[in-house]
């Protein structure tokens, strides 16, 4: 280094790289033992020049974080708030949605696009038409009502198959073909004002009837199913269904006479109280079981006069038993 360069750069490499202090050295200002600094060994071929890093002392600055939520709203939080939020996020959270009650995936949600599409219900309606259902009001009603909303999520993939499915309490939701057949028999091309359903179950058949009749009255004797039907029907906001908790064998004399009565459970006969609540010219459709309980037949009862009824036995079916009382 020349004299001129020495004046401009008075410090040499030996001034920048110094040996660490010994463990027993003391700080000149405080008189306390100095903390030794670790010495990192370098590989044999590495450069001996050590980088000089100057770390300024800067006071912490609280920065705000700008984030956007799902709806696009901008949220501004301080760094301390973000740290507190992170601590809270580590705490266990309770389940917030009804669909999180089980660890299993929700089939109704994962298959929502398929199940709620019009094409799926149209295929069901095509099968009904192929099976002999011809009343356009009934076909339109079956296409309108989302059956998957009335079954358990685990059975949602089977909602539009022609199958009876369990709904709890030893009860079932009837096959779509049976629902359509019974409603078509009850209507028979006539305008329906008041209709009575015995056995609400999950509420599906009442929802279909509501698309065909002006007013639908439905009776359920099992309280949990009565509550479930209300829950299922509430999102659909159907204004012309009136649910009742009571004994279906007694009927609903206060709302009689009815243009049609549909019974969704099989007794050994059709209760006389229900026959008398038919308007003259009205129809009642019900499954009737044999005395030995081995078979059931779909039966059509037509009221032809004040004290006259005509009975026709039609299709072999299978329903849960019709019982009296409430539970």
From Swiss-Prot:
Q: Please list the GO biological process terms of this entry.
A: methylation; protein modification process; protein repair
Q: Which family does it belong to?
A: Belongs to the methyltransferase superfamily. L-isoaspartyl/D-aspartyl protein methyltransferase family.
Region annotated Disordered sits at 1-48
Q: What is its main location?
A: cytoplasm
Its recorded name reads Protein-L-isoaspartate O-methyltransferase
UniProt feature, compositional bias: Basic and acidic residues: 15-30
Question: What PROSITE patterns would the database entry show?
Answer: PCMT
Can you name one GO molecular function term for this protein? Answer: protein-L-isoaspartate (D-aspartate) O-methyltransferase activity
Per the entry, what this protein does is:
Catalyzes the methyl esterification of L-isoaspartyl residues in peptides and proteins that result from spontaneous decomposition of normal L-aspartyl and L-asparaginyl residues. It plays a role in the repair and/or degradation of damaged proteins.
| Species assigned in the record | Paraburkholderia phymatum (strain DSM 17167 / CIP 108236 / LMG 21445 / STM815)
Keyword set, alphabetical order: Cytoplasm, Methyltransferase, S-adenosyl-L-methionine, Transferase
The catalytic activity of this protein is classed by the Enzyme Commission as: 2.1.1.77
Q: Show the disulfide pairing.
A: none
From which domain of life does this come?
A: Bacteria
Q: Where in the cell is it found?
A: Cytoplasm
- Catalytic activity field: [protein]-L-isoaspartate + S-adenosyl-L-methionine = [protein]-L-isoaspartate alpha-methyl ester + S-adenosyl-L-homocysteine
Entries under InterPro entries matching the protein: PCMT, SAM-dependent_MTases_sf
Give me the Gene Ontology terms describing cellular component: cytoplasm
Active-site residues, as the UniProt record annotates them = 174
